[in-house]
Every structure is written in C-alpha cells, then in structure tokens.
Amino acid sequence: MSNTENKQKRVSVGKDIATRRRVARARRHFRIRKNLRGTPEAPRLVVHRSSRHMHVQIIDDVAGHTLAAASSIEAEVRATEGDKKAKGAKVGQLIAERAKAAGIEQVVFDRAGYKYHGRVAALADAAREGGLKF
C-alpha cells in the first residue's frame, strides 16, 4: 500500500474540518466545565464566540440564574469603531459595569473551549480593567 493510500484512509469520512473543530471545542468545553463551578460568591463568566458576535454571561450555577449579560449585538457595542477585537473589549467593559451594578466583584472565567487569544483575551482583559477579579 502506498503512502498516499494510507493518508486517504486516515481521513474521517463524512466530517469536514468545520465539524471536527466544532466537536473538538465542545469536548474542550466539557473538560473545562468538569472543574469550573460558579458560586454566589464567585459566579462563572462564560463567553460564547461566533464568527460575527460575542456573548458573555455571569452565571450562578448553584441557583441556575444569569446575573448579568452583555453582547456585541447591542447598539452600544455596534456603534464602536474598530475590528472584532475592539468590539470584544467593549463587551468586556460592559459586563464589568453590569457586574459592578449587580454587586459582583469576583468571577471564575470560563472560556468555553475557545483559545485564550484574540477576541476572548481582549474581552477578559477589558473586564479585568473594569474591576472584575478572575
């Protein structure tokens, strides 16, 4: 059997690259969530990143309630000039303001299987600058 035939056999049938990446991210998120738990003292700050927008929530896992939320879909963020990274930073500022208004100082950061890079890192840094402690 030639080397090219071996390579062709190793490719998983019926799964494109996008599906494999999505499944791998879901697996990473599952592994991360096994060790993270949001409490009333330190709720979980969870990030969701799509190709166009970012959503972030502060969740108390014990009560099962969302305490604060922010998104790049909001008009305040849409008006922000710049790239997606700048908009992610604006979402981080918003969630920090809303957390402070709700009396939240400390959070547990849940990156949801995404790399701590780019928009996710910009959001986290802006939230830290806004006064949230991770």
Curated annotation (Swiss-Prot):
Keywords: Ribonucleoprotein, Ribosomal protein, RNA-binding, rRNA-binding. GO terms for biological process: translation. SUPFAM superfamilies: Translational machinery components. InterPro entries: Ribosomal_uL18_bac-type (IPR004389), Ribosomal_uL18_bac/euk (IPR005484). One of its GO terms (cellular component) is cytosolic large ribosomal subunit. Gene3D superfamilies: 3.30.420.100. It holds the Pfam family Ribosomal_L18p. GO terms for molecular function: 5S rRNA binding; structural constituent of ribosome. It comes from the Bacteria. This is one of the proteins that bind and probably mediate the attachment of the 5S RNA into the large ribosomal subunit, where it forms part of the central protuberance. HAMAP family: Ribosomal_uL18_B. Belongs to the universal ribosomal protein uL18 family. NCBIfam families: L18_bact (TIGR00060). Part of the 50S ribosomal subunit; part of the 5S rRNA/L5/L18/L25 subcomplex. Contacts the 5S and 23S rRNAs. This is Large ribosomal subunit protein uL18.
